[in-house]
Every structure is written in structure tokens, then in C-alpha cells.
UniProtKB/Swiss-Prot annotation, chains A, D:
Pfam families: ABC_tran (PF00005), CBS (PF00571)
ABC transporter domain sequence ranges: 34-270
Protein name as catalogued: Glycine betaine transport ATP-binding protein OpuAA
Leading EC class: translocase
CDD domains from the UniProt entry: ABC_Pro_Gly_Betaine (cd03294)
Family: Belongs to the ABC transporter superfamily.
SMART domains hit by this protein: AAA (SM00382), CBS (SM00116)
GO molecular function: ABC-type quaternary ammonium compound transporting activity; ATP binding; ATP hydrolysis activity
Residue intervals of the CBS domain: 284-340, 344-403
InterPro entries in the cross-refs: AAA+_ATPase (IPR003593), ABC_osmolyte_uptake_ATP-bind (IPR051921), ABC_transporter-like_ATP-bd (IPR003439), ABC_transporter-like_CS (IPR017871), CBS_dom (IPR000644), CBS_dom_sf (IPR046342), Gly-betaine_transp_ATP-bd (IPR005892), P-loop_NTPase (IPR027417)
Keywords noted in UniProt: Amino-acid transport, ATP-binding, CBS domain, Nucleotide-binding, Repeat, Translocase, Transport
Annotated function: Involved in a multicomponent binding-protein-dependent transport system for glycine betaine. Probably responsible for energy coupling to the transport system.
Swiss-Prot record, chains B, C:
Keyword Ribonucleoprotein: no
CDD domains registered for this protein in UniProt: TM_PBP2
Family per similarity comment: Belongs to the binding-protein-dependent transport system permease family. CysTW subfamily.
Residue ranges crossing the lipid bilayer per the database entry: 19-39, 45-65, 70-90, 94-114, 138-158, 216-236, 243-263
Phylogenetic lineage: Bacteria, Bacillati, Bacillota, Bacilli, Bacillales
Organism: Bacillus subtilis (strain 168)
Purpose of the protein: Involved in a multicomponent binding-protein-dependent transport system for glycine betaine; probably responsible for the translocation of the substrate across the membrane.
Keyword entries, A-Z: Amino-acid transport, Cell membrane, Membrane, Transmembrane, Transmembrane helix, Transport
Family matches, as InterPro entries: MetI-like (IPR000515), MetI-like_sf (IPR035906)
Major location category of this protein: membrane
Protein name per the record: Glycine betaine transport system permease protein OpuAB
GO biological process terms on file: amino acid transport; carnitine transmembrane transport; choline transport; glycine betaine transport
Cytoplasmic side: 40-44, 91-93, 159-215, 264-282
Positions of the ABC transmembrane type-1 domain: 90-269
UniProt membrane topology term: Multi-pass membrane protein
Length: 418, 282, 282, 418
């Protein structure tokens, strides 16, 4: 469907929000291009949103993305005037809401726009059903009809049978489904979702995203989704708006955003790894599980079994690296009562902590066991696993330890003990 | 300090009080009669029911509202009061306290709501409440006597001034403690101020407001003896006369009766089972 | 209920009180003289220092113990009291309150410690404390008058009975709240009971005990007017006589003076900077 | 060093602890072999420890291991009579402590035995130095000398420079070092350590275990270490006592314990995987990361990069599995503007959810990408990774999902949404 066929649901024209006094003067300065700092100095007020201009098409999932403090939640709250815009106009289905009276605005909030909140904002003293029917209750719809409608939305989000429970009895994911059902019961045209899934744990968040997409296919509402998570934006957004410090930096489909990032900022934003920092073995090494040489083969076997690994490094009392114990040898040693010393395998490769990743790439790829990272006194510091190496190179900072050594950084390291 | 011309603060206050008594005389008399009728209505009403029956009713009420333990305490306590012969004075004290508390609620809660909605109102009301609670209760007797002369009415008026602050304070606190994101939710779904207040703010604030009312009851009870100084009948005046006539025995007996009423009312209001959280089926 | 033979509870108490007055007469007189001397000692002592200087000393004390804001309030407050001409009565009230509070601490804290160590003691003491606090303060005047006849001493005695419970209660609470694993640690390293008490339990309980003392001060202050009924001099008797002579102006003035003293003492004791947590270097 | 050369530090003879009334009668019944249930019924009192009999050699790390409720912390607290034994005798260096007077006992606690607690039990109102010197302070040692000794122990545990801080300013690991230093300052012969590392997070726990071993080599105290963690017992114990429901089940070196488990209970205890439960693909499948076919190649690439994976399954709107997208193809597609559909690779193996692990073992080992687990309608349920398969077979329940399906079990599954 090419762009111009779809009717425009929401039109936002030069909308700005200034927090503080002298907002009039600040708007003036904004108009003739003064920077946020100048405005702050001159009027002491901060610019929350700076002349936002965009259109949202009917039935679209329109994602507004930005880090915290980028003005995204202020912008979305201006759409239903929870926050009064300082300047500019907002049209919904062509009617200008920015100069609507209190009562007209209340009608729009009751009929046209519903909202889903990050921390669910469910009423603790009301059951799930009473929460879901709240919107219609305000409009004076009689009890029988509104409860019937509320049950329908609860069914839609898969919460049938939970209507008489209280919010604090449900998990995070289920509470947010109630938030969704409550918003849908008013049968609004537009759904504002303010970081609706950020408070959920990562696994549930992906499920809720899939569900929202299914829901959108069925009920076809226009959804304005606020998030700070790039993956979430890419997965559910038809179009994405990127915001930084109150300014709209770029608008486009996920592909367009990735294809030609409109300026250096966007590039860095999607790049999300600062390649300038060159990584060393210390950055990606994991805690080394070791067995002391004076232990028996069965202890080594049990440790390996518990960690799901098939080989383990043997160290002496000073944690000096002696060699590798393989599970198969340990099994034989246990049967014929040999000690770990007898089955110690001394062929193994070690790397010092500050070797660059690029140098150890080939060593790691052809070794069949994790590479040992040792300090000058041959003492075990950690091990490098192939997965971590690839992940780090691919820029996934999950695999990169903060200050280049593994986790015990904040405690004074063990070496200090005499 | 004596060099400075002393502003005759005392005289100013006296003249101000006289002026009020003049201008609002009629108005105060109206209130006085209404109040007196209300209190005596309670006393005579309760008076009709024989003490044993009334004791059982009180105990049943205590059981229904709160717990079995308290119901038992109420039963034994009131039987003891009756046995010691302080039944009628107890009824008068009960009427005095209940009236003062009812007025505190009827006047206090709306002020509390008003203060919770308007910041400026809250900023004016809070220091006044502090002053009202630290000022010795005796001082309230003076205006009470001037406007309502002697009898149960000035007792009630003084008790109300002394007992109302906690109800107001806790109403404001209860409403203020409702989380901001819930208020935002009510806005987003288009609630009017009234709908927000009655559907969300007040229900969530009930527990705190009840705590305030409990405190008001205790303060009213602590006023009964002082109220006796302006002619308010009941257990208070039993204690007061015992003190003035140095009859320790009677003083302690009447004191115990007050203690029983105080503990019963305190435990009942503290354990009011708030209906809100009845667990729905799964 | 009248059918049952009424046990003359009142007479029993009266005869009991008379018996005590007889047997312990001398003992009570001794206490009376000691107490009177102590209170008057404070009054004359403070009396020597000119009011302006004393006000500054109080303000400095407030600043050192707690915050600048409270020091300022103390300064202005006491200047106002002096200006209104209530300086001497204020000193007397201060002496009465301080004496009662000191006695509450000297007697109350040890009882609290004893109750925290012995469970049976605690089980006896707690209900008595509840009773003491709900019984109207007036009732305490009776024994006070009998044993110490008229003057500041019965006022102090009645105030102590009314004001002491919070200090005892909070001492027990403070010590009980010390976590069990810390107590086990003191045992494991071989502490004697005294070492456990003074090195671990009391230091950790200080904050709660101070809260108890603050409550006792407020209760003592609320007693000043009642104490005046048994001849205790000070702001209390100013209010009491104003009430009996229906002079509202004077009553309000004296009342304000009491409010100033109350708020000053309350803020100071609440903000005592507990030295414990001074952050070390490194 | 053979067993009999080393002198005996602590001798425990038939020590029992009965909680409740009628302890005398209960001891009688214990003596003539009544079971715990019979005693409970007859006397209403429970048997905490049942006739414990063992010796601890001087300078040994003696580990007492058992699940919670096995009586291990009761037993250790009887050694310094924090808990009074109901019957039996305890000798330290040959002196019987069970009938010592209060003062004699206090001397033993001050000089002979020190204790380290699970939740540290540091005095919050005292600085680290004041905590460490507490033991000597009780004995009336003058300030100068005891602070000098305290500083020494703090140095020993690597906490130099922290002496003026307060406990709540330190991390868990460092607080426990203070606990250790406080116990060492009295220079006791015996150290009782009650689950000293259980409250620490796993990484720090391993470091603390190493440090304890180093410390033991240097200062040579006799250490009685209580734990419920088999690995911890194996790693630091010279000898291990296994306790269950108040009874000592077995005493021996880690090797002996593993070699011939003295009875079925011990075997199960060390075995710790209930092999009877046969595992299926559903048990070990992980959450499947997928990309919707209507997205562009750059979105697929970014998702793969963020997850550190080189291939991703493509699904349609109903999450039906269509094929695999490889990172290399996606890179080419991005350059020459192809859609995901063009580069979709349809050779891939799928397995239904309830196939047994044994059956999919060869499929998984020779496939180079994770195996897709699908339901009857070919919809993606999860993926099986080689590591998880090996780990599960090796009995490491970290890889086994509770009820045989991955995490969204407790939320009503998405399928319900129409």
C-alpha cells in the first residue's frame, strides 16, 4: 500500500513543550533557531519537545523511540493533552484538539484515545473486571452492558476466568494484559502505549510483542508505541520516529532507518558498539572452573558433570596452571584408582591477559577446549570460550566485561592475600 | 524587655471575643439548642434500652465490625461499668464523644478533601492544625463558654476543636498517598474530578482516614474531664467532682470506666475489617 | 444489676490510700522536700540569668544539638514569651517539665532494660503501661495530693505517672529490636550480660529510646494545666486561673507561651543528631 | 599423613539435642533405638541431633554437610554451647566442655573457639576496626594492643585501609572478610563457620573458598565448616560429615564419600539428578529468536548481531516456520536490495516437541544450526542447542525447563489469542 492512499489519523504540526516560566519567550527563541542551552540560559526553562512535525496513518503501528530524557513520553502525553502543549497544533481525524474545551477533550479521551502505562496503573482496590470496565463506567454505560464488553476484551487478551482476581494476585505479564484489555474496552480508534513492555522481564516482553502484533492484525487500531529498545522498535514498528533531546531526528520504516541513517547520531545509535575500544583477552575471559591437583578423579568428574563441561584445568595450591584433565581419562582413573597427577595432560595453549582478540582468533577457533588466560606467574586468570569471542567481535556487549578483567574487579583481588 | 510598649494582646483578644458574642449571639444559640437536642437525644434513646440488652448489642456490634476478642472485652467491660453504677454517666460520655467525633468527621473530612485538592488550602490548614493540637485543651473552654455558656454544648465544642485535627490531617494524607500513575490513569480515561475522588482517591484513602478517626476518638475521650469543667455531664464530671472533693476511690472507679470505654472504642475502630480486599474466586 | 451486692470498690481504694499515707508519711515528706528543692533550684538558678542571655543560650543549645531552623524558632519564641511578660512562669513550667522528664528517664529506662531482659517482667509491665496512659490524668492528682499535699511536688508526681510510660515502652522496644544474630554474635565471643547491654544493645536502641523521651516531654507539657489544679506554679496556673476567671485573652496568651515551649522542646529532641553514624575516611 | 598421627582437637561422644518438653524421656527412647516419629508422638518433642559421634583432628578443615533441617547448625552450635546439648559429651583438647561453668565456658569462647556467621552479624554501629577488635575488647585487652592485632587480621583478609568504614558501606564479600578477621583476632584454635559463604553470590563464593584455603595453609587453624552445597564441601573439605534428619549418615574424605556411598540415600544425594524422568525436546528447548518474513534483510542482520548468532529462523504472521536466513545471505541481500523472501533457505530439520533426547541426539550433533522445535501446525515452539543437550544428559538441571515446555508456562500461552 503506497503511502498516500492511507487516511491520516493524527497530524502533529510544530508542537513544542517548554517546562518552566517565560514559555512564550522560549517559544519565540525556538522559532528563530536558538539552541536549548541558549534558551535555558535566557529563560531558565527547559525545552521538552522542540517543534515536532509528523503524521500518523490510520491502522499503523507508529513507534516513537529514544533514550530516557529524549522527550518521547512528553510527546505522547501531548496527544491526549495529559500534558498541555506550549505551541503548535494536533489534529485527530481532522479535528483540532489543541483548543478543545475541557468537556470536549474528556469526550475524546473517553471515546477516541486510550492509554496503556509502563507500570500498568491498575486500581488495586478493584477486581480485574472492575478495572477493565472503568472506561465505560465513567461514560455511564449500564453495568450489564459494560461488563459484557469488558469480558470480551479480557477474552481477547487471554485472561478469561481471571475477572474476579485482584491485580496484586497476577504476574507482571498478566497485569499488562489487563491494562491492554482496559484500553480496548472503550473501543478507541487510537492506543497510546507508553513503554508498555519495559517493566516486564525480557522473555515475557517478546511474547507480549508477538501478541500485540496478532491483536493489531485482528482489531486494526492505530497504535502509538513508545520505547527505548531498538529491537522492540524493529520488531513491531511499521514506521519509527527517532528522538534525541526533544528533537525528531529521523522518521522512516525499520529498513529505511537502518539503510541510510540520516546523520552520524543515528548511525552511532544503531551501531551501539564503540569500535574505538580495542578488545583484549581480559575483556572476554570467563571465570575459570579449576580442580586442585591433590583432589581425586571422582571429585574432578563430579565438578565437570555439575558444570556440563567435558574438560577442566588442574591447578596447584597457588592456583598455578599444571594441565588439563579430560572427563574420559578421569573416568578410567576412577576405575583403576589412579590419581589426577597420573592422568594430567600437559598439552594446552595459554594466552596472556592483554593479547588482542584479533591475535587469538585463530588459536581459539582450532583449539577444541577453551583457551586458558594466565598472568606472568602462570596463574589461572580465566578462560576464553569460542562463543564469547564471536559475540564480542559482533559488538554484543553482553560478552564484554566492563574494565577488561572478569567480575572480581570491585573486591580487592585475591592476589593481595600473602 | 519591659521597656518596649507592651501590645495589650490579651485585651485585643477579649474585645474580639465580646464582639463575636454580640453579633453572632443568635447564631450560636441556634447551634447550642441543636447540639444539646442531639446529645440528649442519644442519651435518652440509649437510656430506654435496659443496660444488659445494650451491653449485648454493643458486644455484637464489636464482633461484627472487628474480632471476637474485642467483643468479649466489650461485654465484660460494660457489665463492670453497669455493676459499678456508672451506667448513666457512661451513656452521657458516650453521647458526648460520639457527637464530637461525628462533627469532626462531617466537618473534618470535607476540609481534608478540599485541602488535598488545593495546595494553597493545604498550606494554610496544616500550621493551624499543628497549633490546635499543641495548644492546651483548657484554652478552648474559654470561647466555648462565651458562645455556648455552661452545659454539654461547650463540652462538645471544645472536644471538637481538640479532636478534629487528626481526621483532617489523615484525610489529606490518605488522598495524597494515592500513587501519581493511578491519578494519571483516571485522567487518561476521562474522569471528572468527582469521579476521580469517589471511584479512586477516597476508596484507597479509607484505611488512613479511619486511623485519623481513631485518633480523634481518643482525643475526644481525653477531653471528657476537662469538658466537665464547663458543665458537661458524664464520667468526666464524676472524675472532676471526685478530684475537687478529694474522693480518690470514686475518682479511680470513674477513671476505670473511662479506660474501658476508651479501650473498647480504640480496638473497634482499629480493627474495622475494610471490605475492599475480599478475595474473589480464582 | 443493682440486685448484686455492690462491692464498695471506692471505699476499699480510699481506705488503702489512707493506710499508705499513714505508714509512708515520712518517706513521702522526704521525697516531697527533695523534689521541691530540686525544682526550685532549677527555677532560681535559671532566674539569675537575665532573660535575653538565657534565650541566646537556649538558641545556641538548639543549634548545637539540632538544626539552624529550630535555633531561630527558639530565639524568636522565647523573646515573644519574655515580651508578653510570661518569662518567670515559663521558667517554672520548664523546671516542672524537665524534672518530671528526668525522673521518667532515671526510673523509666532501667525498668525498660529490666523488662527487655526478663520476659515475665515485660508481661506484667506492658498492661500497666497501657492502663496508665488511657486513665485520665486527673485521677493521678488524687494520690499526688494525699501523699504530697499542694504545690509543685504533686504536680511533678502526677506528670511523672502520666509521662513515664512511653520512655519505658520505647526502651523495651529499642532493645528488643536488636537483631537476634547480633545477640548470638555477642554470645559466641563470650560477652557478659553487661557487656552485651552497654556495647551492643543500648547503643543500637538509642534512637528509639530518644523517641520515647520526646513523647514523655510532650505528655508532661500536656499536664501543666492539670498540675496547676494542685498548686503547681507556671504557665499552667496562668491558663487555669484565666479559665476559672473567664479571661480568654490571658488564657490564649499563656496558651501560646506553652505552645512555643512545646514546639521548641519537641523539635530539639526529634533532631538530636545521633553521633553514631559519622562517616570514617577512606 | 595417616590418620592416627594427628592429635584429636574435638571429640564428640553420643551428643543429642531434643527440642521441646520431656527431653529426658526422649533421650531414653533414642538410646533404645526408637524412631523420631515415635518420640514425637510419645513426648511431643523433636530430635534435632541424634547421638552424634565423631572426632576432629587438629588443623583439619572438617565440613559438616546436609540439606536444611538436617541438624547441622544445631550440631555446630553445641560445640561452643550456644545451644545446650541434651545428652552426650564434648571434649576440646581433652577438657570436657559439656559440664563447664558459665565463666569457664566464657573463657573457652573468648580464647579457644571463634565463629563466623552466614549473614555476617557485624555490629552496624561500629566501624570495621571496632568490629574486628570486639573479641579482645571483651577480654579487657588495652586499646592500643587490640587495635594493632585487629589491623593485622584485616591485612590478612585483604581489607587494609577499610578500617574506618561502616559495615553497610561494604559489599557482601567484604563484610564476610570482616567476619573472618573478627574471628581470627582472638587467635582461637578452632573456627566455626556456619554456612559462611551461602549468602554471597556464586562468583564471590568461589573466590572466598580459595582465600579460606590459602588462609588455612598460612594460619593452620582447625576449621569446622557448615554447608548445604556439595561442590563447596568437595572443594575445601579435608573430611566431610554427611547429615540427614539429625543423623550422621557418613564420614570420610571427598574421594571416600564419592567412591562408596555408604547407603542408597548418600548415592541419591550425590547423584542429584532423578534419571527416572525421561527428557524430551520440550524439556531443553530454548526461546526461539525469529524474524518475520515481511521485514527487510537489514532488520534480520541487526537482530542476529544483537543476539550474537549467525542464522535466524523466518516465520510468517502466524509464527509458522518458513525457513532459515543466514547472516552471509542477508548481507548480500542488503547490498543488492533483495527481500528476505529471496534469500530464504528451506533446507532445515524440525522435530516435534515430545521427541525423546536420545532420538534427536544424532540429528543435533551433525546439524550446524540449532534444531527448530515445532507443533503440529508447523509453528515455531523453540530451538534445541547442542550445549543444552549435552548439559541435560549430564544431569545439570540448569538446562532442564520445569514442566517440559519453555518459560511462558505460567502465562496462558499466546495460542489462545484468536
Amino acid at each position: 500500500m503506497s503511502v498516500d492512499e492511507k487516511p491520516i489519523k493524527i497530524k502533529v504540526e510544530k508542537v513544542s513543550k517548554i517546562f518552566g516560566k517565560q514559555t512564550k519567550k522560549a517559544v519565540q527563541m525556538l522559532a528563530n533557531g536558538k539552541t536549548k542551552k541558549e534558551i535555558l540560559k535566557a529563560t531558565g526553562s527547559t525545552v521538552g519537545v522542540n517543534q515536532a512535525d509528523f503524521e500518523v496513518y490510520d491502522g499503523e503501528i507508529f513507534v516513537i523511540m529514544g533514550l530516557s530524557g529524549s522527550g518521547k513520553s512528553t510527546l505522547v502525553r501531548m496527544l491526549n493533552r495529559l500534558i498541555e502543549p506550549t505551541a503548535g497544533n494536533i489534529y485527530i481525524d481532522g479535528d483540532m484538539i489543541t483548543n478543545m474545551s475541557k468537556d470536549q477533550l474528556r469526550e475524546v479521551r473517553r471515546k477516541k484515545i486510550s492509554m496503556v502505562f509502563q507500570k500498568f496503573a491498575l486500581f488495586p482496590h478493584r477486581t480485574i473486571l472492575e478495572n477493565t470496565e472503568y472506561g465505560l463506567e465513567l461514560q455511564g454505560v449500564d453495568k450489564q452492558e459494560r461488563q459484557q464488553k469488558a469480558l470480551e476484551s479480557l477474552k481477547l487478551v487471554g485472561l478469561e476466568g481471571f475477572e474476579h482476581q485482584y491485580p496484586d494476585q497476577l504476574s507482571g505479564g498478566m497485569q499488562q494484559r489487563v491494562g491492554l484489555a482496559r484500553a480496548l474496552t472503550n473501543d478507541p480508534d487510537i492506543l497510546l502505549m507508553d513503554e508498555a513492555f519495559s517493566a516486564l522481564d525480557p522473555l515475557i516482553r517478546k511474547d507480549m510483542q508477538d501478541e500485540l502484533l496478532d491483536l493489531h492484525d485482528n482489531v486494526g487500531k492505530t497504535i502509538i508505541f513508545i520505547t527505548h529498545d531498538l529491537d522492540e522498535a524493529l520488531r513491531i514498528g511499521d514506521r519509527i520516529v527517532l528522538m534525541k533531546d526533544g528533537n525528531i531526528v529521523q522518521i522512516g520504516t525499520p529498513e529505511e532507518i537502518l539503510m541510510n541513517p540520516s546523520n552520524e547520531y543515528v548511525e552511532k545509535f544503531v551501531e551501539d558498539v564503540d569500535l574505538s575500544k580495542v578488545l583484549t583477552a581480559g575483556h572476554i575471559m570467563k571465570r575459570a572452573e579449576t580442580v586442585r591437583i591433590d583432589k581425586g578423579p571422582r571429585v574432578a568428574l563430579t565438578l565437570m558433570k555439575n558444570l556440563g563441561i567435558s574438560s577442566i584445568y588442574a591447578v596447584d595450591k597457588q592456583k598455578k596452571l599444571l594441565g588439563v584433565i579430560y572427563a574420559s581419562d578421569a573416568k578410567k582413573a576412577a576405575e583403576s584408582d589412579l590419581s589426577l597427577q597420573d592422568i594430567l595432560n600437559t598439552e594446552f595453549t595459554t594466552v596472556p591477559e592483554n593479547t588482542y582478540l584479533t591475535e587469538i582468533f585463530d588459536v581459539v577457533s582450532d583449539a577444541n577446549i577453551p583457551i586458558a588466560v594466565v598472568d606472568e606467574k602462570q596463574r589461572m586468570k580465566g578462560i576464553v570460550v569460542r562463543g564469547a569471542l564471536i559475540g564480542a567481535l559482533a559488538g554484543n556487549n553482553e560478552y564484554i566485561n566492563a574494565e577488561g578483567t572478569n567480575e572480581q574487579t570491585q573486591d580487592p583481588s585475591a592476589q593481595e592475600v600473602k | 524587655m519591659d521597656r518596649l510598649p507592651r501590645i495589650p494582646l490579651a485585651d485585643i483578644i477579649d474585645r474580639f471575643v465580646d464582639w463575636i458574642t454580640m453579633t453572632f449571639g443568635g447564631f450560636f444559640d441556634g447551634i447550642a439548642n441543636g447540639l444539646a437536642a442531639f446529645v440528649n437525644g442519644i442519651v435518652t434513646g440509649l437510656g430506654f434500652i435496659p443496660s444488659i440488652l445494650l451491653t449485648i448489642i454493643f458486644a455484637a456490634l464489636a464482633w461484627w465490625i472487628s474480632t471476637r476478642g474485642i467483643a468479649l472485652f466489650t461485654l465484660i467491660g460494660f457489665l463492670l461499668i453497669d455493676y459499678l453504677g456508672y451506667w448513666d454517666p457512661m451513656l452521657q460520655t458516650l453521647a458526648l464523644v460520639l457527637t464530637s467525633v461525628i462533627i469532626s468527621i462531617v466537618v473534618g473530612v470535607p476540609i481534608g478533601i478540599w485541602a488535598s485538592q488545593k495546595e494553597t488550602v493545604r498550606r494554610i490548614v496544616t500550621p493551624i492544625l499543628d497549633l490546635m493540637q499543641t495548644m492546651p485543651a483548657f484554652v478552648y473552654l474559654l470561647p466555648a463558654i462565651f458562645f455556648f455558656n455552661i452545659g454539654v454544648v461547650p463540652g462538645v465544642v471544645a472536644s471538637v476543636i481538640f479532636a478534629m485535627p487528626p481526621t483532617i490531617r489523615m484525610t489529606v494524607l490518605g488522598i495524597k498517598q494515592v500513587p501519581a500513575d493511578l491519578i494519571e490513569a483516571t485522567e487518561a480515561f476521562g474522569s471528572t474530578t468527582a469521579q476521580r475522588l469517589f471511584k479512586v482517591q477516597l476508596p484507597l484513602a479509607t484505611k488512613t482516614i479511619l486511623a485519623g478517626i481513631n485518633q480523634s476518638i481518643m482525643l475526644a475521650l481525653s477531653m471528657v474531664v476537662i469538658a466537665a469543667m464547663v458543665g458537661a455531664p458524664g464520667l468526666g464530671s464524676e472524675v472532676y467532682s471526685a478530684v475537687t472533693q478529694l474522693k480518690t476511690g470514686v475518682g479511680v472507679e470513674a477513671g476505670i470506666a473511662i479506660v474501658i470505654v476508651a479501650i473498647t472504642l480504640d480496638r473497634i475502630t482499629q480493627n474495622i475489617k475494610v471490605k475492599k480486599k475480599s478475595r474473589g474466586n480464582a
